[in-house]
Amino acid sequence: ISGQLEHGVRAFDLRPTMDNNSTLGNIYHSILDTGVSMGDAMEYFDSFLKTHPGEGIIVIMRYESERQFLSPSIAEDNYKTAMKNFLWNNRIYQSRMAAFNKSMTMKDLRGKILIISRNDLSPVSTFETAYTQWSHSNSVGEALQIYGTGGLGRIYVQDMYSAEKNGNSSEADFLAKKKELVCKLLDITVPFREYDQNNWVINYCSGYAGSALASDSYAKNAASTNPAALEHIQAHTGKGF
């Protein structure tokens, strides 16, 4: 995480697990252990923000239940309780938490950490987290809901991460569709700056073309999607990007 921060990453997709019915485990991605806990992550964030107080960090977070394929299943409600206890007791989060507001800007985030949870951690007023609906659809443009202490807002999500989510298509069709969706959501967001700034957008370039357990599957997607997104942004500079 510290290396990613130094290279310019400011948004993180963290997926904590459970070691038992009451204790948070490490952050995983699917069945892969990152070796980092939520406490570790907060330490990395705090250290970075101390030396870069003008920066802010966004964490998109959800319970990585897929780890439970490797061990007995632990209910989401147990995770919610454990995570709320962690947020309540973690001194770093309590000192750096950014209260969600649908119209917040970077000014409100500087020196702080905003958590957007894909699991409802109500009451959100206790922890200042935001809760968002999510989508893995192979279409974009549907407005979902995001809410917290700062009210209810709209959010647009593009997170089609596999051929399975594209109707079990071929790898080539998935890669083509992924590029199309990334660029389409970029285009949809342009008018927001002028007409309605109270919209949130999460546009994932990540995904895999092939087996979820093969590193080259992710490399294939990155080699296809990342240049397409960059070229689209460069071609539209000055139009809201």
Residue ranges: model-predicted function:
Residues 1-10, 17-241:
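Catalytic cores of phosphodiester-bond hydrolases, prominently lipid phosphodiesterases
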